[in-house]
Amino acid sequence: MKDKFDKIMEQFLIPISDFEGPVMDSTYFMKNDGSFVFSEGYCHPEGAFWGMIIKYPLPGGHIDIFGREYSWTHRVEIDGELCIIPNHQQVENQFKVAPELRAFQGEKPPYARNFIKFPLSDFSGYFDARHSMRELRKEYKWIDEVVRKTCELLEWNPDDTGVTGSLAYGRIEDDVDMMFIGTPEENAAIAQKIRRYVESNPEARVFELGKEWPLRFYYAGTLICPFFRYADSEQIPLLDCDIEILEEGIAMEATVADDTHNLYLPAIVGLTDLRREDGSSEGDMELIIYNGALRGEVWKGDRIRINLTIINLTTPSAGTRRAALITEEDQYTIVEKH
């Protein structure tokens, strides 16, 4: 007999046999054991993807998902406040939950040091962002209203949105992780409208987990957590890339010259006026920010200080060029905000 969990999964989960790829960032997948796994970024191995187990079945676990007990790998409660577990500990937690994955890892590319490689064969299904949004809007009037009002504010078609987070698998929480699916130019325009709205309405600003989140905002009585996705996979800059490390631990200051792709994982920004700590200069280059918490953090005109890795970046469309890579939140600070 099917329980509530099974019935809701029938509504939201799409069989993995229907998955055509490529693996898009911020997509939830369900492992055969019932764990919820979140994909990270766009550059993935053939037949696998980089991601993290977020919630996993655990008898006696403190999270109720439609009548089944779960726990999570990335958060801990300290003195009554939720805190994010450091990245290295999150990675180790993956192997505590699924020790068989350790043998599958192999050598990781530098951008994936905080993620785990999962074979697609380990999954029963995935949660499509658009499909989940349609189901939620049909079933919950308040979600439909929030989506319509938010899209009206941002001058966007609500049918070109999706959801991620727990909403992707039908679990209702207080916030809406709304995904905007457009061209880089369209998504950039939405982000600028959000920034202008927050600047004009300071009460809409969001402070969580010890920081301000520049793209999150309160609207229509709800916390809106925007995510952005490329509508066309051909517009993804690093869908297929190769990275070779040249120098590590290089301290520089630079000015952001191009923020077209700063909304995604990875966030990619063009840098100019680069100065090493010793005073020597560098030519203009791209900075690849491979950390989901840093989406939308830096913008054109910002002067930033970064502790980075110099790499050779190779892509089919642009060949090989020098670039910079960071993967941790503490690897950059904003010296001067534009």
Where are these regions (language model features)?
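Catalytic core of pol beta-like nucleotidyltransferases
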Residues: 2-174, 181-338
